[in-house]
């Protein structure tokens, strides 16, 4: 009987796993598009299917009341062994209640080192101190820097503004303790990818009001999310079905973070969540006329205004806060920001965020170094150490970031 029960259990698990895999692969080929401009398209297909497979399993566990889907996906992602470097000392610490990883070169330094505050990406729902460990190791070793990676709390368990608050608290703690970690207060950089770029941007903007703290020397924004207001720009239309960040996944993350009902998807997609007078207030910064024409060549049509759904607007209007959408911060704040390095990717749903923020910064006299990855897609840097599933684009981004940081 025991053997029979085990056989049935193993068989059920095998059928479940195979069925899930076939569903994910079929859905990928039916709904997602890999442009010719992306090198190694099959690597991206495999990564996309693996991610959606973990989320599919997670959704099943969520329906059973066992955990949230992103929690299960994060659990599986964190099973990947951590890379280590004999030249870098890594410590797991807490800044108050916030977990952080501290990376410091083993070789002693006669002078205070440059400091990097790193915020990982993951759409506010996944990503961790472990998933971005290799990036932080390289930054510490190759820039001879002290790196603090912030383990902020994530959605859907923790809604806005918890992530923002955690990042600001951790940054403030570090800036108040630079001498403890051997960091030069005149050389502190913030850095982040995706929503980590959001955190780096928001933190830098909020620190403008803190003259009592050391001033941030530079910020590095890697395909950042910078506004949650307009979802009809050229990159949203061109890259809507391109992994690793499709429109469906982006809106799911949006709803998890801001506690918005996912039933508003079609309303938001068609721009019916925003009253015309509100759009006019921010159009000077978000309008497609601010985007160079060459980025509209793959297709763009202006979305005509439809009837506004006031219920959707009332639920979503919290995104008009600059801590959600730092692209709409006032000139008096943006003009005081430090030198900025921005990395954008052609096949990224959020590409235009980088283009619009670059223009805002430059218009206000803030020095900007911009790198555009013609073969890049959202999330490519997170696959930096994935071996056969990594991309040359990720290595180029890493090299450019290191080159920028070494200036300071």
Swiss-Prot record:
Give its E.C. classification number: 3.1.1.-
Family matches, as Pfam families? Abhydrolase_3 (PF07859)
GO terms under cellular component = membrane
Q: What domain of life does the UniProt record list for this protein's source?
A: Eukaryota
Report the main location listed first in the record.
membrane
Write out the residue ranges of the motif Involved in the stabilization of the negatively charged intermediate by the formation of the oxyanion hole: 120-122
Cellular location(s): Membrane
Glycosylation sites noted in the Swiss-Prot or TrEMBL record: 321
Q: How does it sit in the membrane?
A: Multi-pass membrane protein
Active site annotated at which positions?
Answer: 194, 348, 378
Q: Name one GO molecular function term.
A: carboxylic ester hydrolase activity
Q: Where are the transmembrane segments?
A: 2-22, 46-66, 109-129
Top EC class for this record: hydrolase
Keyword terms:
Glycoprotein, Hydrolase, Membrane, Transmembrane, Transmembrane helix
Can you tell me which family this protein belongs to?
A: Belongs to the 'GDXG' lipolytic enzyme family.
Protein name as catalogued:
Arylacetamide deacetylase-like 3
